[in-house]
C-alpha cells in the first residue's frame, strides 16, 4: 500500500508542548532551564547558575571558582525535595551535567520555532485512491490505509481498526517506552555518580595509604639511624680508650729514651776526661746511674692484636633479608596508631579494606 507521506509535530499538540514546558522549568528562577543543566544526587535538575546562587547563599565564606584560595567545599539543600547536597572543593562545577535534559530543551525550542503552517497536521492521502484520506489501519499488514482499500482493494480480506484507536495505542506504547528509557537513563546516571564517588574514594584511600607507607618507612629509617649512632658511639669510645693507653706508653717510653740518651752523652763526655783524678771523681756516680738506668723496667707493650677492631663488625645480611620480605597484608586491620594519623579533610573509607605493612618478627624494626 503506497501513500503520500505527511507528518505531525514531533512533540504533539499545544497541550503536550505546554506540559513539556512545565517539566523544563527551573524551580529557582522559574524560567526554562538554561544550559548547562546539572543533575543533583537526588536526581532533580537545576540551572548551574541557579545552583551556584543557592550554594553561594548557603556558603557565604566559600571562594568563587576563579579565586586562588583553596576551599574545602560546602553544602546546600535541593529546592525541590530539601535533600542535602554535599559538594567538594569544585563547588557546583563538580556536579554532573544532564545532557538528556539539555537535548530535550534544544528539541523543544526547535519545535516551538516552527512556523504555524508547518505545525498543522497534514493528512495522508491514498495513492491508489487519490481522493481518499488514510483513515484506517490494517492490523494484518500493519500499515495505514483507506476505506476503499478495505472494501475493494488490497486489504479487503484483512482485519482493520480505526486509525485514531491504533494511533492512541501506539502513542501510549511509545510514551511508556520513553518513560522506561528516561527512567533507565536516570538509573544509569545514578550508577555513574556512584562510580565517580568510588573513584574519588579510591584516590582518597590510596593517598592515605601512601602517606602511611612513607611514615612507616621513615620510622624504619629512624630506627636504623638511631642504632647506627649508638654503634658508632661505642666504636668511638673503644678507639679513644685504646689510643689513650698506647699514647701513654709512647710518652713513658719517650721519657725513658730521653733520660737514657742524656746519661749516655754525659758518660761519653766523662770518658774523654784526660785527668785520671778528675775522671775518678765522676766515674763512680756515672757507673751507678748507668747501671740503674739499664735495670729500669718499662711498662709492658700492647699485646699482639691490640690494634684490631674486628669485634665491632656488624652483620646486617639477615636484617636486610627480613626487610626485603616486607609486604602488604590485604584485609588486615590497621595498627592502633593509624587512628592517630587521620588526614585533615579526608573522609570515607567505608567498604574498602586497609593494607598495612608486614614487618617480620625478630628484625628489631617494629
Curated annotation (Swiss-Prot):
UniProt entry keywords in alphabetical sequence: Coiled coil, Cytoplasm, Cytoskeleton, Developmental protein, Differentiation, Metal-binding, Microtubule, Zinc, Zinc-finger
Gene3D superfamilies: 1.20.5.170, Classic Zinc Finger, Zinc/RING finger domain, C3HC4 (zinc finger)
Zinc finger (RING-type) in chain: 26-82
SMART domains named in the record: BBOX (SM00336), RING (SM00184)
Annotated SUPFAM superfamilies: B-box zinc-binding domain (SSF57845), RING/U-box (SSF57850)
UniProt-annotated binding residues for Zn(2+): 126, 129, 149, 155
Function recorded in the entry: May bind and stabilize microtubules during myotubes formation.
Official protein name in the record: Tripartite motif-containing protein 54
The organism of origin for this protein: Mus musculus (Mouse)
Amino acid at each position: 500500500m503506497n501513500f503520500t507521506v505527511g507528518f505531525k509535530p514531533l512533540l504533539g499538540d499545544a497541550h503536550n508542548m505546554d506540559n513539556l514546558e512545565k517539566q523544563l522549568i527551573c524551580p529557582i528562577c522559574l524560567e526554562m532551564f538554561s544550559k548547562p543543566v546539572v543533575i543533583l544526587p537526588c536526581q532533580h535538575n537545576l540551572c548551574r547558575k541557579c545552583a551556584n546562587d543557592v550554594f553561594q547563599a548557603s556558603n557565604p565564606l566559600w571562594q568563587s571558582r576563579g579565586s586562588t584560595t583553596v576551599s574545602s567545599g560546602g553544602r546546600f539543600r535541593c529546592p525541590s525535595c530539601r535533600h542535602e547536597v554535599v559538594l567538594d572543593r569544585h563547588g557546583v562545577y563538580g556536579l554532573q551535567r544532564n545532557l538528556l535534559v539539555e537535548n530535550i530543551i534544544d528539541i523543544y525550542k526547535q519545535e516551538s520555532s516552527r512556523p504555524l503552517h508547518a505545525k498543522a497536521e497534514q493528512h495522508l492521502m491514498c495513492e491508489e485512491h487519490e481522493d481518499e484520506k488514510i483513515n484506517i489501519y490494517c492490523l494484518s499488514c500493519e500499515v495505514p490505509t483507506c476505506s476503499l482499500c478495505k472494501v475493494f482493494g488490497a486489504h479487503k480480506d484483512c482485519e482493520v481498526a480505526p486509525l485514531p484507536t491504533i494511533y492512541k495505542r501506539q502513542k501510549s506504547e511509545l510514551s511508556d517506552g520513553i518513560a522506561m528509557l528516561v527512567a533507565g537513563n536516570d538509573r544509569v546516571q545514578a550508577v555513574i555518580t556512584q562510580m565517580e564517588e568510588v573513584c574519588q574514594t579510591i584516590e582518597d584511600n590510596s593517598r592515605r595509604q601512601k602517606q602511611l607507607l612513607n611514615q612507616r618507612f621513615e620510622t624504619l629509617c629512624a630506627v636504623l639511624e638511631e642504632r647506627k649512632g649508638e654503634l658508632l658511639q661505642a666504636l668511638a669510645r673503644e678507639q679513644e680508650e685504646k689510643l689513650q693507653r698506647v699514647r701513654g706508653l709512647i710518652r713513658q717510653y719517650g721519657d725513658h729514651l730521653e733520660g737514657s740518651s742524656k746519661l749516655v752523652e754525659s758518660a761519653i763526655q766523662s770518658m774523654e776526661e784526660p785527668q785520671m783524678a778528675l775522671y775518678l771523681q765522676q766515674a763512680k756516680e756515672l757507673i751507678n746511674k748507668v747501671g740503674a738506668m739499664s735495670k729500669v723496667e718499662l711498662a709492658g707493650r700492647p699485646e699482639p692484636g691490640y690494634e684490631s677492631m674486628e669485634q665491632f663488625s656488624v652483620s646486617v645480611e639477615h636484617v636486610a633479608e627480613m626487610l626485603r620480605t616486607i609486604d602488604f597484608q590485604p584485609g588486615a586491620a590497621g595498627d592502633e596508631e593509624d587512628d592517630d594519623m587521620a588526614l585533615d579533610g579526608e573522609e570515607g573509607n567505608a567498604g574498602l579494606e586497609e593494607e598495612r605493612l608486614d614487618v617480620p618478627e625478630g628484625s628489631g624494626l617494629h
